[in-house]
């Protein structure tokens, strides 16, 4: 089979502490459901001459590609604030694929069976959550947000027992890497400085070679990740994305969004929005995502202390100074992001007040977060009656005055707004409808959503139904992690 796989498995060459060698557990009757041909092309992979039967074997793990070397990665994590040793309990990294341009991508099977890290789990995944990760990760990519992507989904032909009996599935995830803050926590917990140094050098070599010659690699790695994760959470806030399970094992060192378990997009603007059924106290609510980002980065910094300086007090001082810049950096980036969403060029001292007035009005009137910005661009939306409001008109007058500052024009502002305000997001009720149909063998709506979400900033009025929130508020909408 000439597909174009070219594996160079650098992580497999790390010491045994970092991973366990394990093959995917074969499944009975794999059936390919989705193959992401656009992503395959980006990876320089050609599946055009491969029949569905062989595709099913490849993406179920029943037939591993030549050159692959499958492993389960070890990591730890703070899960809702509580530290625990974890690891890939239902996934295997089959290898690192190199494209013709020497770009390196992890290829991982999720739902591929038990591993030494499975504990009491069955190592399997359910069809609905795997399709959900596929569609939302692809949507995030086209929203211009760093993310893992999905290459394929295969039904296993086997039942999986959760709250009910469901169809089993395996997702093929593609990522710049699967190193997590939790990877560093795992190695740090072993208190082996040599392994920690190996991990830092490996991380810099793979992701951040520009700091390879740094005099303080550990400190510079901390600074790089602070910057990466600050920008990532800004992007989430921009589109109303709520990750739902921001445990340290779900914070990627590459700066990608990873692990789409109970995530969802906010419809009605409410900063306290939580969708995850297990987040009863709202730890990972929309408004808390920046704070949790810093909390996770602090856990990362703790791992690096021994290599920031041999003097522990000095190391803590340097790490704290780096972390203390987070709030101001986030505030500056958030303000600039919101200026872009409102088409505001330049800076005015009243900008934050103007932004907060709008957000407070949206919260009070239960206005849709995405559609409010679409409405301000003079685009057609359904259910625009909420904007027929005296307070909104008063705010809009102030906004229009601010738009023309610095010699700006309304048309120029709309161009700026159009580049960062999506016309369409993965609406929760539409995702659920598509998944319900897909579970019954009908992928029509799923494929339609994928097609539209590939161009989120350019949507026709004919797609108004897919742009609109649920007929009733999604206050009671809940998501589940699928494990």
From Swiss-Prot:
Catalytic activity of the protein: L-seryl-[protein] + ATP = 3-O-(5'-adenylyl)-L-seryl-[protein] + diphosphate; L-threonyl-[protein] + ATP = 3-O-(5'-adenylyl)-L-threonyl-[protein] + diphosphate; L-tyrosyl-[protein] + ATP = O-(5'-adenylyl)-L-tyrosyl-[protein] + diphosphate; L-histidyl-[protein] + UTP = N(tele)-(5'-uridylyl)-L-histidyl-[protein] + diphosphate
Instruction: Mention any Pfam family matching this sequence.
Output: SelO
Q: Provide any one GO MF term from the record.
A: magnesium ion binding
In terms of domain of life, where is this protein from? Bacteria
Keywords on record: ATP-binding, Magnesium, Manganese, Metal-binding, Nucleotide-binding, Nucleotidyltransferase, Transferase
EC number(s)? 2.7.7.-, 2.7.7.108
**Binding positions (ATP):** 87, 89-90, 110, 122-123, 173, 180, 259
Q: Which InterPro entries match?
A: SelO (IPR003846)
Q: According to the UniProt record, which cysteines are disulfide-bonded?
A: none
Give the protein's cofactors: Mg(2+); Mn(2+)
Where Mg(2+) is bound, by residue?
Answer: 250, 259
Q: Which residues does UniProt mark as catalytic?
A: 249 (proton acceptor)
Q: What's its job? A: Nucleotidyltransferase involved in the post-translational modification of proteins. It can catalyze the addition of adenosine monophosphate (AMP) or uridine monophosphate (UMP) to a protein, resulting in modifications known as AMPylation and UMPylation.
Q: Spell out the PANTHER family in the cross-references.
A: PROTEIN ADENYLYLTRANSFERASE SELO, MITOCHONDRIAL (PTHR12153:SF15), SELENOPROTEIN O (PTHR12153)
The UniProt similarity line reads:
Belongs to the SELO family.
This chain belongs to the protein called Protein nucleotidyltransferase YdiU
């Amino acid at each position: 089979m000439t597909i174009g796989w070219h594996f160079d498995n650098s992580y497999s060459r790390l010491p045994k502490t970092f991973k366990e060698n394990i093959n995917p557990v074969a499944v009975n009757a794999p059936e390919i459901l989705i193959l992401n041909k656009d992503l395959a092309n980006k990876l320089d992979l050609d599946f055009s001459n491969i029949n569905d039967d062989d595709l099913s074997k490849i993406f179920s793990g029943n037939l591993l590609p030549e050159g692959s070397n499958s492993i389960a990665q070890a990591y730890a994590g703070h899960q809702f604030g509580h530290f625990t040793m974890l690891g890939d309990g239902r996934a295997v990294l089959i290898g690192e694929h190199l494209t013709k341009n020497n770009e390196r991508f992890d290829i991982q099977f999720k739902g591929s069976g038990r591993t030494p890290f499975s504990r009491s789990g069955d190592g399997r995944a359910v069809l609905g959550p795997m399709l959900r990760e596929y569609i939302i990760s692809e949507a995030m990519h086209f929203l211009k947000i760093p993310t893992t992507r999905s290459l394929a989904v295969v039904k296993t032909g086997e039942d999986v027992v959760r709250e009910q009996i469901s169809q089993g599935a395996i997702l093929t995830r593609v990522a710049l890497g699967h190193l997590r803050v939790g990877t560093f926590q795992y190695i740090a917990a072993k208190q082996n400085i040599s392994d920690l140094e190996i991990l830092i050098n490996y991380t810099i070599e793979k992701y951040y070679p520009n700091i390879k010659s740094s005099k303080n690699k550990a400190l510079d790695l901390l600074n790089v990740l602070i910057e990466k994760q600050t920008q990532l959470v800004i992007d989430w806030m921009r589109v109303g994305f709520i990750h739902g399970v921001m445990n340290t094992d779900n914070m990627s060192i590459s700066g990608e969004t990873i692990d789409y378990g109970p995530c969802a997009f906010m419809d009605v603007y409410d900063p306290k929005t939580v969708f995850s059924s297990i987040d009863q106290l709202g730890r990972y609510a929309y408004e808390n995502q920046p704070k949790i980002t810093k909390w996770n980065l602090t856990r990362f910094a703790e791992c690096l202390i021994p290599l920031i300086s041999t003097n522990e007090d000095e190391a803590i001082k340097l790490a704290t100074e780096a972390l203390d810049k987070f709030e101001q950096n986030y505030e500056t980036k958030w303000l600039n992001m919101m200026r872009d969403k409102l088409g505001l060029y330049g800076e005015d001292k009243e900008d934050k007040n103007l932004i907060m007035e709008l957000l407070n009005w949206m919260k009070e009137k239960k206005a849709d977060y995405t559609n409010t910005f679409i409405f301000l661009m003079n685009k057609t939306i359904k259910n625009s009656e909420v904007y027929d409001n005296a307070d909104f008109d008063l705010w809009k007058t102030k906004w229009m005055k601010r738009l023309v500052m610095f010699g700006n024009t309304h048309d120029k502002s709309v161009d700026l707004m159009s580049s960062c305000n999506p016309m369409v997001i993965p609406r929760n009720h539409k995702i659920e409808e598509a998944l319900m149909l897909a579970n019954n063998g009908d992928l029509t709506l799923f494929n339609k959503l994928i097609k539209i979400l590939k161009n989120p900033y350019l949507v026709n009025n004919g797609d108004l139904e897919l742009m609109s929130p649920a007929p009733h508020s999604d206050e009671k909408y809940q998501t589940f992690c699928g494990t």
